[in-house]
């Protein structure tokens, strides 16, 4: 039986006989064809950038300025707004034109990348080694591989510095902690102290420690990008100028599939970190655009009812709840005054609408009685009703909505998708690392194509 993929219709270099890989193995057919593999990668970049541009314009077309971004299911406009484009005090969108420009620029770029991808996949030289030796490579060439690694690191470093320059010189970025409820501002005094910045890496990942995810001021974030950008650029230069040391030559597997597995592992780690960042961090991901974090929504509900009942005459400092603990306020394990009730589990939340009400020992009773501002009440009521939760129970006491309410927080989408993708990339890492190590050790067998069970079965037709 002849199919499109195993008969005379197949092009040489794309069929199983000439490459050793079936059609569905994708780029594996191009392992030794550097020109064609370049085409596949450039075309893939074109698809990615096309999605970014098209989705960007789709979100602009559907955007309603009267509603917060997180109520509209947006995931790209919040990123642009966080970079300070088109927004003003309180995260209010003043101008959607920068978002339109972003979408169009990505679409134009994707056309260029798409053309380059098709050119290199179909028309360009199959291999680059002969005509363009700078761009050519052999997977086993350790020196060339570390040079390519160095170039990638320099490009990543430049990317980190682009954010730094945007924050310092080109209009600034959105700071959710700006007084009065957030605003766009230029970052002036960067944190460059290594003890502070690398201290984040040494913190525990649990509770109020929160590892690097606990960063809560833009000076630290932008200063961290200065350090990271510098490390990437200098590390890139170092990798270009040096050859791998003997221990690295011995310890690592030097093949295309091994490099794929290393990359998948790195992206998996990035995915898990991004998941935690978007779920817990309301500085890098301001709640004005992404909606409140889970702990933030829970604390906002406690705050909203404290405000309500205090107006109705409750003494919030001494009222007892059903468990004998404070109904509105209680003490944390370390003695701070915190919100009572089920939200006690989130007592280490920090949020811009709540911090002005804290004193040296936690929430300040006199400020809660005299200093609560209308914008704090409005924001907490809004956050209370937009928790990033699709759960029916055990949600920190937050009143969950009935099924008729059509709201899913972008935090839920972004955290869940990055967790799932991070997990699958990790599985991909294990798979390709195992294959690469087996091939290097010389016992890679694969499926025996000569005695595959399906070959002895009656054809379907």
Curated annotation (Swiss-Prot):
<keyword id="KW-0812">Transmembrane</keyword>
<protein>
    <recommendedName>
        <fullName>Photosystem II CP43 reaction center protein</fullName>
    </recommendedName>
</protein>
<dbReference type="GO" id="GO:0016168">
    <property type="term" value="F:chlorophyll binding"/>
</dbReference>
<feature type="transmembrane region" description="Helical">
    <location>
        <begin position="57"/>
        <end position="81"/>
    </location>
</feature>
<keyword id="KW-0793">Thylakoid</keyword>
<dbReference type="Pfam" id="PF00421">
    <property type="entry name" value="PSII"/>
</dbReference>
<dbReference type="InterPro" id="IPR044900">
    <property type="entry name" value="PSII_PsbC_sf"/>
</dbReference>
<keyword id="KW-1133">Transmembrane helix</keyword>
<feature type="transmembrane region" description="Helical">
    <location>
        <begin position="122"/>
        <end position="143"/>
    </location>
</feature>
<feature type="binding site">
    <location>
        <position position="355"/>
    </location>
    <ligand>
        <name>[CaMn4O5] cluster</name>
    </ligand>
</feature>
<keyword id="KW-0602">Photosynthesis</keyword>
<dbReference type="GO" id="GO:0009535">
    <property type="term" value="C:chloroplast thylakoid membrane"/>
</dbReference>
<dbReference type="InterPro" id="IPR036001">
    <property type="entry name" value="PS_II_antenna-like_sf"/>
</dbReference>
<keyword id="KW-0007">Acetylation</keyword>
<comment type="function">
    <text>One of the components of the core complex of photosystem II (PSII). It binds chlorophyll and helps catalyze the primary light-induced photochemical processes of PSII. PSII is a light-driven water:plastoquinone oxidoreductase, using light energy to abstract electrons from H(2)O, generating O(2) and a proton gradient subsequently used for ATP formation.</text>
</comment>
<keyword id="KW-0150">Chloroplast</keyword>
<keyword id="KW-0597">Phosphoprotein</keyword>
<keyword id="KW-0148">Chlorophyll</keyword>
<dbReference type="GO" id="GO:0009772">
    <property type="term" value="P:photosynthetic electron transport in photosystem II"/>
</dbReference>
<feature type="modified residue" description="Phosphothreonine">
    <location>
        <position position="3"/>
    </location>
</feature>
<keyword id="KW-0479">Metal-binding</keyword>
<dbReference type="GO" id="GO:0045156">
    <property type="term" value="F:electron transporter, transferring electrons within the cyclic electron transport pathway of photosynthesis activity"/>
</dbReference>
<feature type="modified residue" description="N-acetylthreonine">
    <location>
        <position position="3"/>
    </location>
</feature>
<feature type="transmembrane region" description="Helical">
    <location>
        <begin position="166"/>
        <end position="188"/>
    </location>
</feature>
<keyword id="KW-0472">Membrane</keyword>
<dbReference type="InterPro" id="IPR005869">
    <property type="entry name" value="PSII_PsbC"/>
</dbReference>
<keyword id="KW-0157">Chromophore</keyword>
<feature type="propeptide">
    <location>
        <begin position="1"/>
        <end position="2"/>
    </location>
</feature>
<keyword id="KW-0604">Photosystem II</keyword>
<comment type="subunit">
    <text>PSII is composed of 1 copy each of membrane proteins PsbA, PsbB, PsbC, PsbD, PsbE, PsbF, PsbH, PsbI, PsbJ, PsbK, PsbL, PsbM, PsbT, PsbX, PsbY, PsbZ, Psb30/Ycf12, at least 3 peripheral proteins of the oxygen-evolving complex and a large number of cofactors. It forms dimeric complexes.</text>
</comment>
<dbReference type="GO" id="GO:0009523">
    <property type="term" value="C:photosystem II"/>
</dbReference>
<feature type="transmembrane region" description="Helical">
    <location>
        <begin position="279"/>
        <end position="300"/>
    </location>
</feature>
<keyword id="KW-0934">Plastid</keyword>
<feature type="transmembrane region" description="Helical">
    <location>
        <begin position="243"/>
        <end position="263"/>
    </location>
</feature>
<keyword id="KW-0464">Manganese</keyword>
<feature type="transmembrane region" description="Helical">
    <location>
        <begin position="435"/>
        <end position="459"/>
    </location>
</feature>
<comment type="similarity">
    <text>Belongs to the PsbB/PsbC family. PsbC subfamily.</text>
</comment>
<dbReference type="InterPro" id="IPR000932">
    <property type="entry name" value="PS_antenna-like"/>
</dbReference>
<dbReference type="GO" id="GO:0046872">
    <property type="term" value="F:metal ion binding"/>
</dbReference>
């Amino acid at each position: 039986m002849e199919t499109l993929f195993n008969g005379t219709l197949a092009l040489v270099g794309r069929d199983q006989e000439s490459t050793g890989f079936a059609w569905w193995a994708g780029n594996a057919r191009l392992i030794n064809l550097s020109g064609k593999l370049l085409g596949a990668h450039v075309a893939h970049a074109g698809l990615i950038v096309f999605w970014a541009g098209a989705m960007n314009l789709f979100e602009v077309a559907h955007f309603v300025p009267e509603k917060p971004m997180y109520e509209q299911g947006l995931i790209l406009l919040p990123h642009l707004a966080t970079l300070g484009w088109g927004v003003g005090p309180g995260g209010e969108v003043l101008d959607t034109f920068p978002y339109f420009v972003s979408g169009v620029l990505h679409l134009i770029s994707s056309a260029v990348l798409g053309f380059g991808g098709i050119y290199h996949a179909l028309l360009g030289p199959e291999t680059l080694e002969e005509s363009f030796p700078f761009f050519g490579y052999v997977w086993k060439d350790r020196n060339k591989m570390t040079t390519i690694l160095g170039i990638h690191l320099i490009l990543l470093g430049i990317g980190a510095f682009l954010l730094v320059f945007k924050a310092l010189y080109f209009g600034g970025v959105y700071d959710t902690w700006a007084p009065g409820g957030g605003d766009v501002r230029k970052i002036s005094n960067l944190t460059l102290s290594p003890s502070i910045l690398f201290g984040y890496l040494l913190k525990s990942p649990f509770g109020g420690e929160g590892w690097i995810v606990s960063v809560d001021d833009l000076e630290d974030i932008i200063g961290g990008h200065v350090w990271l950008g510098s490390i990437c650029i200098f590390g890139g230069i170092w990798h270009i100028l040096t050859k791998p040391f003997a221990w690295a030559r011995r310890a690592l597997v030097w093949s295309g599939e091994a490099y794929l597995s290393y990359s998948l592992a790195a992206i998996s780690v990035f995915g898990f970190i991004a998941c935690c960042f978007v779920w817990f961090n309301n500085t890098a991901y301001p709640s004005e655009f992404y909606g409140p974090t889970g702990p933030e929504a829970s604390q906002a509900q406690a705050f909203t009812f404290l405000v309500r009942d205090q107006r109705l005459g409750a003494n919030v400092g001494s009222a007892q709840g059903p468990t004998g603990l404070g109904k509105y306020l209680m003490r944390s394990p370390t003695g701070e005054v915190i919100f009572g009730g089920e939200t006690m589990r989130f007592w280490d939340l920090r949020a811009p609408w709540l911090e002005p009400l804290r004193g040296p020992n936690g929430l300040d009773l006199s400020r809660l009685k005299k200093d609560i501002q209308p914008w704090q009440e409005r924001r907490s009521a809004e956050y209370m009703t937009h928790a990033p939760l699709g759960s029916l129970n055990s949600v920190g006491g937050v009143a969950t909505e009935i099924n008729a309410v059509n709201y899913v927080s972008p935090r839920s989408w972004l955290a869940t998708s990055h967790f799932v993708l991070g997990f699958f990339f990790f599985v991909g890492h294990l798979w390709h690392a195992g294959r690469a190590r087996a091939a290097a050790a010389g016992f890679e067998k694969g499926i025996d194509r000569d005695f595959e069970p399906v070959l002895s079965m009656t054809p379907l037709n």
